[in-house]
From Swiss-Prot:
Enzyme class: transferase
InterPro entries: P-loop_NTPase, Rhodanese-like_dom, Rhodanese-like_dom_sf, SelU
Protein name: tRNA 2-selenouridine synthase
Gene designation per UniProt: selU
Function: Involved in the post-transcriptional modification of the uridine at the wobble position (U34) of tRNA(Lys), tRNA(Glu) and tRNA(Gln). Catalyzes the conversion of 2-thiouridine (S2U-RNA) to 2-selenouridine (Se2U-RNA). Acts in a two-step process involving geranylation of 2-thiouridine (S2U) to S-geranyl-2-thiouridine (geS2U) and subsequent selenation of the latter derivative to 2-selenouridine (Se2U) in the tRNA chain.
GO molecular function term, any single one: transferase activity, transferring alkyl or aryl (other than methyl) groups
Amino acid sequence: MRNPDIGIDDLTALFIADTPLIDVRAPVEFTQGSLPGAVNLPILNDEERALVGTTYKQQGSEAAIKLGYEMVSGSVKQNRLQQWLDFIHQHPRAILYCFRGGKRSQITQQWLRDTGIDSPLITGGYKRARQFLISTIDRFSEHRKLLVITGPTGSGKTRLIHDISNSHPVLDIEALARHRGSAFGGMSVPQPSQIDFENHLAVNLLKLEQNNLSEPVIVEDESRHTGKVYLPDSFFHHLRNSEIIWVDEPLATRVDNIFEDYILTTPIGQAQRIRQAIPPLASTVETREILRQQARQLFDKYAGALQAISKKLGGDRFQEVSEDLENARSDFENKNEIQSNKIWIEKLVRYYYDPLYLGSLQRRRVNPCFKGSGQAVMDYLQARK
């Protein structure tokens, strides 16, 4: 008995279950945007797809299909078929899709059936699933309440959201964007494409819709852009018009938080701990040198981020913070000391982040329903349940 294909009514269950997907589109299409849970195992590579497309325009559908079969035959066909079979062997629930649920996924499905494997495909393909995900964002933004955690840079907003994630519905936008949302906030892994960001956001919202429907989803206050990706209009408008809680921590605590995130838990802090350990931590010379090189690259990255905001800082303050950063680099290289990083961090917060963030909140005329320390906010949230 054949497995039924996946219609529009089945997409909710598919995404909630993190179903493995085989995207048989060309790599160039996959890179622009794909469905969460998908691996790209194309039936046509980029060059073959382009040739088929040209033939379709010039000679019509029949000639294009004939060319496709000719190019993907013999050992080429067997290699691609084996890739699909290997993936399905590891993920028996895998589902196929192409752009519109047309020839590419249908032919893939038939070739698999010829081997005795029956894999469903998404009816309407990527295009229909993408429309479903966009509508999910719009529906969520209209019907589900948000509770927005705001506060100056270093207040520990992201950490707070992680700490309450087992007891409250939360959404971590920065994790989805793979960016901490500041000039210095790029992570070690590349950001997703805009389409991939939206698709993963939609799946997270879809999962949040399944439980605690009366309880607001807790989310960190974000600008429209987080790094190079941006929030869809409907969701950003909802975010800006939702109830707000303000995390209020003293400057010293905020500097400590930033120091932990950007120095202590990075290769800078790791390299420093290995070098100062008595007895020495078990590590190879190669490992120590890799960490040291990564630490140098991170200092270079911070210097570049500082340069990018130099005009907003102003010449004198930019020069001052730059010198503090270079002094911290020198202390790390020559003394294995990292505490001096707090000097440039503290000045960057006072000179740049506080005026920027607090000015934005004032312009928005934010009126929080609660304001207090991180612990006080956690207690307040628990009392609201």
